[in-house]
């Protein structure tokens, strides 16, 4: 009998969505105070678990850097991060404008909030189908390539634990890709992912395998259960 595949040497890729940002403000791309605390608490959880990362990747957005800084405040000895622009989020305003020519309402009322996400779903679906091209953004295939190139890099360069800090869109896209699901699956995955949530892939040089998605082990107990946010 051959060795069990579960005994084969595998690395683990820990994908982290950024902490709470400034949704609805003039500058979304910065963490709130709660967002920093969420990520610092995740770093403390990782430290308590004895995780040691041999590699770190992050997107190039401000909220990615600030999230990693908060994680690192509780994780001494992290390797220098490799900045990977392919891990940047899509431009949600550009997606919205691709399907809505009228002035966009700030999502600060229940009705405006529902309209925001209805239009976002429509814009993302049409972008993925090649029916619209949001201004200043890559094609859907280009966006997907940015994400999968990061996964390829991890498989080819690492064998142990790797930390990746990104956004909901790229992480959801990575999950859908690994599961060989339709691209539109990434939309629903994306709209459910929580701030500072952890997603885990086991990996070998040939492939990634989903282990967990959108978990918050660092916020499972009081007083942290009130820290759960989505934007």
What role is predicted for each listed range?
Residues 12-14, 19-73, 136-144:
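Loop-to-helix element that buttresses phosphate recognition and phosphoryl-transfer chemistry
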Residues 2-9, 88-112, 141, 156-161, ...:
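Acidic, low-complexity terminal tails and accessory targeting/binding regions
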Residues 2, 7, 43-119:
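Phosphate-coordination/substrate-recognition cap region in phosphate-metabolizing enzymes
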Residues 19, 168, 214-216:
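Active-site metal-binding loops of divalent metal-dependent hydrolases
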Residues 163-165:
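ATP-dependent carboxylate-activation loops
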Residues 168-172, 204:
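GST superfamily/GST-like fold recognition
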Residues 49-51, 154-159:
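Glycine-rich phosphate-binding loop signature in dinucleotide/nucleotide-binding domains
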Residues 107-142:
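Short glycine/proline- and acidic residue-enriched helix-loop micro-motifs
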């Amino acid at each position: 009998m051959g060795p069990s595949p579960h005994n084969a040497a595998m690395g683990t890729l820990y994908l982290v969505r950024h902490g709470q940002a400034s949704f609805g403000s003039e500058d979304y791309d910065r963490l709130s105070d709660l967002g920093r605390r969420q990520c610092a608490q995740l770093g403390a959880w990782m430290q308590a678990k004895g995780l040691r990362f041999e590699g770190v990747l992050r997107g190039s957005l401000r909220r990615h850097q600030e999230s990693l800084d908060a994680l690192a405040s509780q994780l001494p000895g992290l390797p220098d991060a490799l900045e990977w622009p392919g891990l940047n989020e899509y431009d949600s305003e550009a997606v919205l404008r691709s399907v809505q020519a009228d002035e966009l309402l700030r999502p600060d009322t229940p009705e405006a909030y529902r309209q925001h996400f209805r239009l976002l779903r429509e814009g993302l679906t049409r972008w993925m189908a090649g029916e619209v091209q949001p201004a200043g953004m890559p094609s859907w295939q280009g966006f997907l390539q940015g994400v999968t190139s990061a996964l390829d890099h991890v498989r080819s360069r690492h064998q142990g634990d790797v930390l990746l800090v990104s956004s909901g869109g790229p992480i959801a896209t990575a999950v859908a890709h690994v599961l060989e699901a339709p691209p539109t699956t990434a939309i629903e995955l994306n709209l459910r992912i929580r701030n500072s949530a952890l997603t885990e892939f086991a990996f070998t040089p040939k492939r990634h395998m989903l282990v967990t998605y959108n978990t918050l082990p660092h916020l499972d107990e009081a007083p942290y259960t009130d820290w759960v946010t989505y934007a």
